[in-house]
Structures are given as C-alpha cells and as structure tokens.
Regions:
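Hydrophobic faces of well-ordered beta-strands that scaffold small-molecule active sites
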Residues: 37-43, 68-70, 97-101, 118-120, ...
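Active-site mouth loops of central-metabolism enzymes
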Residues: 34-52, 97-104, 179-191, 247-257, ...
C-alpha cells in the first residue's frame, strides 16, 4: 500500500490541474500533452463484415468521435482491417482507428499493418489460462514475467518501426491468474499488470503508449487510475496518458450516471486524456454524452485555492470517513447509518409529502446545519474549530464542490472532529448539470466523504430525490433498485444485447436487492460482472450461459429460454419476489 504523504497521485488534491503527460500520436489525432481530451467509441461489428464496420466508423466520425475502436477477435478479422481502412479513407474520413485484441498476439501483429493503434489486454496477451490460479507459484509468476518480455518485445519493436501507438488496456474482469495469485483481485493487480507490460516499452525506448485500467465498478476504476499515476512516479517511468472509462455501464440514465461517477471523478482529478462512455446503446449515442461530460468537468484555471492542513489520506483503498451520528428532523445522519437522501423542507411543503426522501432539510441556516459558502469559511473554521459546536452537520455550498468538501474533511480531521458532512448540490434540468453532480458526488463518496445528499433545483422535487438515490447506486455507495451491469456490445457479442437488456430490465426490474450482469461474450463478461449476483452471458451463437456470482451454473441454454431459466435460478436461490 502506498503512503499518500510521500507518493501522491497528484501534486495538490485541493487544486485540480490536468496531469502532464507524454503526447501520443494516433494518425492525425493527439492524445495527452496539451491536446484536448479525445472522445472515442467502438463499433459493434467485426472487420469481416466490411460494409457494416465501415458504415459504423463513418457514422461515429460524423458525430465527432475522435478515435474509433474495432474488435478483431481472430487473425482473419485483423486481416479484414485492410479493406475496412481502404474504404474508410476512400470516403474521405481521416478518423484514426484502433484494433481491440484479446487472446491473439498474431492478430495484434496483423492489425499493426493496417490501423494507427492497437489495444492489447495484459490479462490474455501471454497469460491465457494455461495455469489455473491453484497451480500458480512464485516460480511460475517469475517465469511468466519472462514470457511477457519474450512475447511483447517484438510487438513493441514492430509498432515502433511502423509508427503505431499501443494501448495497454487492463480490464478488472480479465486479470491473469498470475496477477491474481500475486496481488489478489485488487487494484494493485490491475496496476502491476499494466506496469509489467509498460516496462517492456520503457526498455525499448518506446513512449507512444496509452494506458487504461477499466472496471464496471466506478470505485475500483477511480482507485486504479490514481494508483497507476502514483506508481509511474515511483518507478520513474514517463507520465503516459490515460484512456479512461467505466466498462459495462449499462443503458439510459443509469449508464450515463455510472459513467459520470467514474469518468467524471477522474476528469476532476485531471487524470483523463481520452475517454469512452460505454453504453448498451447505438455507439453513436455514446459520443455526445462523452462530449458533454468533458464540458461538465472542465478544470478551471481560476478555481479557488483551499488553504487547509493536509493530513495523511489513502486515496487508493475505500474507507468511509468515521463520523458521529447527528439527528436532523428526527433522522440520524452519520455514524453507521447509510448515506441518507433528503429534500428541502419547502419542497416537501410543495409536494405535500417527502416521496422517497428520508429527511427534510429545514434550511442551510437551521441547526445543526453549518454552511460554508466559500474557501475562506473553511479556512476560518480550520483556524478556530471550537467556534462551531460539536455534533454539527457541515455543508459546503461554494465553488468546486469536490475540492471544497475534501478541504472541509481535512479541516475537520485536523481538529479531531468527526461531525458528519452533507453533500448539497444545486442543479438545473440540463444533462450537463446532471453529469457534473454525478461526477462530484461520485468522487466524494468514493473517498468515503458524505453522510447525506440533498440535490436542489429540479422543477419536480421528487426527481431530485430519485437522482440522488441513482447517483449513490451508480457510485456503488447504496443500492435502491435492481443493479444492471451490461456491456456496450462489440463484434464479439453473440446476441442482440440491446433487445435482451430491455427484456431483462422489464422482467427483473422490481428486484431491489439483486444485481444482474448482461454480457455479450466470455472475454470480459464473467470477470466484469464479478460484483453481480447473477449473470446472463453469451456462450455461443444462440446459446446462453447463466452465472451465479463468478460460477457458471447453467450452460448451453437456447437464447429463447434463457430469461425464464434465469427466473428459475433466482427462485431456486430464494431471491425471487413477485412484482
């Protein structure tokens, strides 16, 4: 575990600036350095289907996608990229293309011939499951490292010769057995998986590398990228740019909120150089959401500075801030209570009921609430904490919510105070505001900060309450409805995932305490839905495998029977409730 006081992931956690990185050229596009944050997406087709792949690539470029990724699961698919690229360029489209490779090093070498960038997965480029976790030893771990250098060095040399870029793309769901043996199923395992491959690039003096550490859990993704930034400093490696995303985010508002909670938090930390919002929708729908998220989380050069004591804080492993409970409107907030969701008292009067809100906030000037409106208020408290009685509910409503609440928590810790913190956000009905609030709250609860949430500003107050609950669920802080983990679809997907996602939501959406993964294939599916209670995974054309946790329990089910078989499985486990 790293010591934050000696090896931080950013220079100042109270003043966000974009991380300085190497600049990577991908065709005509630039990633990192002083280049704008690049938006990318992925086609749902295989290169062998040339017409559809070209059409989707052109459609993505038309809506402003800065880089298009195409999966190439086989050597034949990688070879098919030649014709795809010819037609894309013949259409006058200059958007750079990246090939996405799993399990097939030969396909990766072939793809280098035709596209500007190739993504490889350290979890399966060399370590393809020859040894199971039970068979791993310290000796096999070291031998595996030698095999990585032996296999990956020629690939790096070829990329360097051709002027291509490489993405070392780690997925939480597909860590190798070697890494899990040494580090466990942890963010450390994700980071060291990337570091191992990056060491080969460094040895070859090749710096046209982008790094990614993705997970379907925003908390895991945030922690992993932070830790990677710190480890690069510790290893004295170059500061390579980061491609940031939350895998399997889902569809609709839930997918957007989960993406904002994870990607937005990293944008606010200055750690993102290119992003993809992974939605179980048409790929074209991802691009405007990503563009809006970048705008919403834009770092401001004139953002205020927070002058507070800086205390040791581990930003790489989740731990909720310890607080004492405070009672507000008859409801306990803080301590061992879940993060509460409230609404303003005047909104309660307007609607005549609290709806699903757990408490009514009488006002930011009503005891025990203590409102700080700007950085000077926090600095004043830090200088004289005894002026505010213990057992208060603190709230920061000034600019830069994330930095302000971090500073407030640091000031409370310096004074040895454990008063709870209310996260209060003002919002309009715009998507930009919604994404920003999700990023703010997602970042803070990932840091273990916040004991209650009030979102204010919607015309219909109950929408504010619903949004607060949805953000807490997106950030894996509190569950209030069925949690769906679904992949965005690509050329590896074995069924119509958008259609199936809709059917599963309709059939299982009433199960509040259940988490269900809907995955198109076996590459990342079983791992990325590791947090799910049950899983629906493509096992072959027209065939589905059902999972309970990480275990496949029903295989080779005809697709037309799979949803009802999932109902039966949940019933067998005593988790089913009638709607």
């Amino acid at each position: 575990m790293l010591d934050f006081t000696t090896l931080p992931y950013v220079d100042d956690r109270f003043k966000a600036v974009r991380r300085e990185t190497v600049q990577v050229r991908v065709g005509d596009a630039l990633i990192g350095g002083n280049a704008p944050i690049l938006v990318q997406s992925m086609t749902t087709t295989k290169p062998k289907d040339v017409e559809k792949t070209v059409a989707e690539t052109l459609a993505l470029a038309k809506v402003g996608c800065g880089l298009v990724r195409i999966t190439a699961p086989t050597f034949a698919d990688a070879a098919g990229l030649e014709e795809v690229m010819k037609r894309v360029r013949a259409a006058g489209c200059k958007v750079p293309v990246s090939a996405d490779i799993h399990f097939q090093p030969k396909a990766a070498f072939e793809a280098l011939k035709w596209v500007e960038k190739v993504r490889i997965n350290p979890g399966n480029f060399v370590d393809t499951g020859i040894l199971t976790l039970d068979q791993q030893t310290d000796k096999s771990f070291d031998e595996g490292k030698e095999k990585v250098a032996e296999a990956f060095t020629p690939f790096v040399q070829e990329a360097k010769r051709l002027g291509r870029a490489i993405r070392i793309g780690v997925n939480h769901g597909s860590l190798s057995a070697r890494m899990i043996y040494r580090y466990g199923d942890t963010v450390e395992g994700m980071v060291e998986s990337a570091i191992e491959y990056l060491a080969v690039c460094e040895a070859e003096h090749f710096d046209q590398v982008v790094l990614s550490l993705k997970s379907s859990n925003p908390r895991v993704a945030i922690s992993a990228y932070r830790l990677l930034a710190a480890r690069l400093k510790q290893e004295h490696f170059k500061p390579y740019p980061f491609h940031v995303g939350v895998t399997e985010a889902g569809a609709g508002s839930d997918g957007r909120l989960k993406s904002a909670a994870g990607i937005g938090a990293l944008l606010l930390d200055g750690l993102a150089d290119t992003i993809r919002v992974s939605l179980t929708e048409d790929p074209v729908a991802e691009v405007p959401v990503a563009q809006e998220l970048i705008k919403a989380c834009e770092l401001k050069a004139d953002a205020p500075k927070f002058a507070v004591p800086v205390l040791e804080k581990d930003p790489y492993h989740y731990e909720r801030r310890e607080t004492i409970p405070v009672t507000l409107a008859g409801v306990k907030i803080g301590g061992s209570e879940p993060v509460r969701v409230g609404m303003k008292a005047d909104a309660v009067s307007l609607t005549g009921e609290r709806r699903n809100a757990e408490f009514a906030l009488p006002g930011l000037d009503a005891k025990p609430v203590v409102e700080f409106k700007d950085p000077m208020d926090i600095a004043g408290f830090a200088a004289n904490p005894n002026a505010v009685p213990e057992g208060s509910l603190f709230c920061y409503t000034g600019p830069e919510m994330v930095m302000g609440v971090r500073a407030l928590a640091s000031a409370l810790a310096a004074a040895d105070r454990k008063d709870p913190i209310l996260l209060y956000a003002k919002i309009t009905d715009s998507e930009k505001d919604t994404l920003r609030v999700s990023a703010d709250i997602g970042s803070l609860v990932t840091d273990g900060l916040g004991d209650a949430v009030v979102i204010d500003g919607y015309k219909n107050p109950k929408d504010s309450v619903i949004l607060a609950f949805d953000i807490l669920q997106a950030a894996y802080c509190r569950r209030s409805k069925t949690n769906f983990i679904s992949c965005p679809s690509c050329g590896r997907t074995l069924y119509d995932i958008q259609q199936v996602m809709g059917k599963i939501k309709a059939r299982f959406g009433h199960l509040q305490d259940i988490s269900i993964g809907i995955m198109g294939c076996i590459v990342n599916g079983p791992g990325e839905m590791a947090d799910a209670d049950f899983g629906y995974v493509g096992g072959g054309p027209g065939r589905i495998t059902l999972f309970e946790g990480k275990t496949a329990v029903k295989k080779n089910i005809p697709e037309e029977d799979a949803i009802e078989e999932l109902v039966n499985l949940i019933k067998e486990r005593g988790r089913w409730q009638e709607p």
